[in-house]
Swiss-Prot record:
Organism: Hyphomonas neptunium (strain ATCC 15444)
Name by which UniProt lists this protein: UPF0145 protein HNE_1325
Organism superkingdom: Bacteria
Family (UniProt): Belongs to the UPF0145 family.
Disulfide bonds: none
Amino acid sequence: MILTTTHTVQGREIREYKGIVCGEVVIGAHLGKDILASFTNLVGGRSNAYESTLRETRDGAIAEMIEEAQRLRADAIVGVKFDYSVIGQGGSMMMVAVSGTAVTLA
């Protein structure tokens, strides 16, 4: 499956627009990671625990979107866009959403 943030696939012609596809994953905050992230923020640097979780969450959202495009028999997803939102009471959860347009290529 070809994924691109652009609205075209270089060197290929879009034959048919199949529709909007998306994937969403919500993760909850974890006390251990929060403590580690707080310590990292105090001493400077990056929080590997949060970055790893965010990467896994983003990959899960992409996988959901690809599954939806495959059900539509698409060859590619164009105009891919990511959105990150803090949700839940007190901002206790984060949602990663990805969307794009499923297309077939000539």
